[in-house]
A protein has these predicted regions:
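A short alpha/beta connector and helix-capping loop motif
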Residues: 167, 189-192
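Active-site-proximal loop/turn and secondary-structure-junction residues that shape catalytic pockets
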Residues: 14-16, 44-48, 73-77, 113-117, ...
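Non-cysteine beta-strand/loop elements that form the S-adenosyl-L-methionine
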Residues: 67-71, 177-182
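Alpha-helix capping/termination and helix-coil
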Residues: 173-174, 186, 190
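Active-site acidic/histidine proton-transfer and metal-coordination neighborhood
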Residues: 64, 80-177
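Charged, low-complexity C-terminal accessory regions
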Residues: 1-4, 156, 177, 185
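Alpha-helix capping and helix-coil boundary motifs
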Residues: 16-24, 117-120, 191-192
Length: 192
């Protein structure tokens, strides 16, 4: 049986980060350690333009403090967009996010699926599954098979949310009407 580890941390910085005198992104791991947390989600929701060098520096600071890092990909990703160009651009955004989190030493990118727009949920789901397959192939082709794409849902009526139907064997826990948490084993952190 697989061993599971629950990690806790914020997505981005809270008001207490600056209230406690912290100012720089590289201080996030120290802040999290002081707060007794062991994870963080680096926010690129409005677009991420972090260099590989800065990402690696942030990741090293996180490992030094035993902080597991994931990354939230841009909100404008649309896995179920009816315009093929938007879906293909979404794959590029996923690749950019994957490169950044990989440089940080993380393995997970959080991705919103987008909305159903003017098509049925079934059509949107088919498009999203196709886009996810293309995104996974792009990750594999680039040597980033270690990166997990983690779909996140928002509980909005027009959002595509039936991920559990797509991945019925994935262990999960329905924590609210707003999200599915995919429970996976997380490897031990190393200072390497």
């Amino acid at each position: 049986m697989a061993e599971f580890t629950a990690l806790f941390g914020p997505a981005g910085n809270s008001e207490s980060f600056s209230a406690m005198g912290y100012r720089k992104t590289l201080q996030v791991p120290e802040y999290l350690e002081e707060m007794g947390l062991d994870a963080c989600e680096y926010q690129c929701g409005r677009g991420g333009n972090i260099s590989q060098e800065k990402a690696a520096e942030f990741g090293a600071a996180c490992r030094e403090k035993g902080i597991y890092v994931s990354l939230h990909a841009p909100y404008y990703i649309s896995l179920s967009g009816v315009e093929e160009s938007k879906r293909l651009n979404s794959i590029n955004y996923i690749l950019q996010a994957a490169r950044a989190v990989n440089a940080m030493g993380g393995e997970r990118i959080v991705v919103h699926s987008g909305s159903c727009s003017k098509i049925s949920r079934e059509e949107a789901l088919a498009l999203a599954m196709d886009t996810m397959g293309l995104a996974q192939k792009a990750l594999d082709d680039e040597g980033l098979s270690n990166i997990h794409i983690c779909p996140e849902v928002m509980g909005k009526i027009n959002q595509l949310e039936p991920w559990k139907r797509c991945f019925p064997s994935a262990p999960s826990m329905n924590v609210s009407s707003h999200a599915w948490i995919l429970v996976t084993s997380i490897p031990a952190l190393s200072a390497a």
